[in-house]
From Swiss-Prot:
Allosterically activated by ADP and other diphosphonucleosides, and allosterically inhibited by phosphoenolpyruvate. Belongs to the phosphofructokinase type A (PFKA) family. ATP-dependent PFK group I subfamily. Prokaryotic clade 'B1' sub-subfamily. Keywords: Allosteric enzyme, ATP-binding, Cytoplasm, Glycolysis, Kinase, Magnesium, Metal-binding, Nucleotide-binding, Transferase. One of its GO terms (biological process) is canonical glycolysis. Substrate binds at residues 125-127, 162, 169-171, 222, 243, 249-252. ADP binds at residues 21-25, 154, 185-187, 211, 213-215. Its cofactor is Mg(2+). The lineage of its organism: Bacteria, Bacillati, Bacillota, Bacilli, Bacillales. This is ATP-dependent 6-phosphofructokinase.
């Protein structure tokens, strides 16, 4: 192993730059050459590859987004796309690859592994929906972004004695909604993994009113329904004319938290070590504060599950 490359793919997540920095500096420390691939798998197929030095990743640790850029390239799921990618890797004499991203990125990494190219996956997505790890890079930052907004919205909800609905990201996973709702004391948390009944939500709000509560916050993951649709349905149950805030892509941006920076640094360094050990086809993660690695194929077979105990706790504490 003399030369490795790194790419970021799919939706950006705060901490991707920190992970890239760790990969580059750890690899150079170990005597390897490092190349950056712009625009994910699209850039790989097009040969948009550049050499990275120690200085290339300076002033990156605190920056959100990804300086390697990102793009979605569904064509990489085809044999033609994968063979073009491997052709470019061989052309640039690259011996191993690190892929930072979510579920779709892992599918690309697995495809390269099956074709005999050593590839390591690093979980980078704000949704925290990757198996094999307790946390993904970017989740903690997104969580704190949502919590900051929730706290501010509660101020105005209190002032005007209103119900507010906050729509957060999470098409298939409700981790952002759950964790932010618990941390922010939301009166109701609506996630894709748990069915909900509007009668139960209204009953919870009514009980709050009966004991003097004059405002409420409901956090809704976008994968369940839009915040506006939820407000429309809620309005059919009486005088709950809620205001809606859609946080959108602000959740993806911002300077990564200390937790995400440290996590990204640890995972990036371990990815390089695995390539040096000739152990491709793995994805790194963190379990109980220990860095672990798992087979990418096995991770893709597993479905991310919501922390049921945490969900139940949030329900109890929001009474």
């Amino acid at each position: 192993m003399k030369r490795i490359a790194i790419l970021t793919s799919g939706g950006d997540a705060p901490g991707m730059n920190a992970a890239t920095r760790a990969v580059v500096r750890k690899a150079i420390y170990e005597g390897l050459e490092v190349y950056g691939i712009n625009y994910g798998f699209l850039g790989l197929v097009n040969g948009d590859i550049r050499k990275l030095e120690l200085g290339s990743v300076g002033d990156l640790l605190h920056r959100g987004g990804t300086f390697l850029y990102s793009a979605r390239y569904p064509e990489f799921a085809t044999e033609e796309g994968q063979l073009k990618g491997i052709e470019q890797l061989k052309k640039h004499q690259i011996d191993g690859l690190v892929v930072i991203g979510g579920d779709g990125s892992y599918h690309g990494a697995e495809a390269l592994t099956k074709r005999g190219f050593p590839t390591i996956g690093i979980p980078g997505t704000i949704d925290n929906d990757i198996s094999g790890t307790d946390f993904t890079i970017g989740f903690d930052t997104a969580l704190n972004t949502v919590l900051d907004a929730l706290d501010k919205i509660r101020d105005t909800a209190t002032s005007h004695e209103r119900t507010f609905i906050i729509e957060v990201m999470g098409r298939d996973a409700g981790d952002i909604a759950l964790w932010s709702g618990l941390a922010g004391g939301a009166e109701a948390i609506i996630v894709p993994e748990e069915s909900f009944n509007m009668d139960d939500v209204v009953d919870r709000l009514n009980k709050g009113r009966e004991r003097g509560k004059k405002h409420s916050i409901i956090v809704v993951a976008e994968g369940v329904m839009s915040g506006n649709e939820f407000a429309k349905q809620l309005a059919e149950y009486g005088d709950y004319h809620a205001r809606v805030t859609v946080l959108g892509h602000v959740q993806r941006g911002g300077s990564p938290t200390a937790f995400d920076r440290v996590l990204a640094s640890r995972l990036g360094a371990r990815a390089v070590e695995l390539l040096l050990e000739n152990r491709g086809g793995l994805a790194v993660g963190i379990r109980e504060n220990r860095i672990v690695e798992n087979n990418i194929g096995e991770i893709l077979k597993e479905k991310h599950t919501l922390d049921q105990k945490l969900f139940d706790l949030a329900s109890i504490l929001s009474i």
